[in-house]
Amino acid sequence: MNASHMLTNRVQSMEESATLKMSAKARELKTKFDDVISLSLGEPDFDTPEHIKAFAVQALADGYTKYTPVTGLLEYRKAIQTKFKRDNDLEYGMDEIIVSNGAKQSISNICQAIVQEGDEVIVFSPYWVSYSDIVGLAGGVMVPIKADIEQDFKVTAEQLEKAITSRTKAILFSS
């Protein structure tokens, strides 16, 4: 049964993720060849370090098996706060630190929360392939600014000033 009639036009207009397409192709090729390297998902080519595995097992044994606060566990947020102060001399309040399951989720949440129909979101190009769908699903219009090898992948102030309009709602800067 095809349930696509139940999906919104916005969802139906989305393209299949190029990242997931390439990952599936790499998995397929790995069944036929030994020397396939997948550069699609950014998965590390090494196993999770033993001390992290042990910590995860201990966390399960200690009962960390329930939903966490939406912003993340306070002890983790405090550790992040300490790290930024110690390593980067940056000070953030607890209300400025959120732990999520990844950048894609956070960026999607932000766009859904602040982007209105027709709002513009400036994105530096090259960019991650999901950004256009994330912005579009929120009703926004993505405005890419190209920063390629000739510019050492750095956007200029002039480029940014030219891209900003009265409809600009956000500048997406994620590395």
Positions of predicted regions on the chain:
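Active-site phosphate-binding strand-loop segment of PLP-dependent enzymes
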Residues: 143, 149-175
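CheY-like receiver
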Residues: 25, 110, 159-163
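Conserved PLP-anchoring active-site segment centered on the Schiff-base-forming lysine
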Residues: 113-135
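N-terminal small-domain helix-loop-helix segment of the aminotransferase-like
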Residues: 2-102, 109
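Residue-level detector of anion-binding/catalytic polar loops
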Residues: 35, 120, 141
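A short helix-loop-beta submotif of the ANL/AMP-binding
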Residues: 137-143
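Short acidic capping loops at alpha-helix termini that bridge into adjacent secondary structure
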Residues: 92-97, 117-120, 166-167
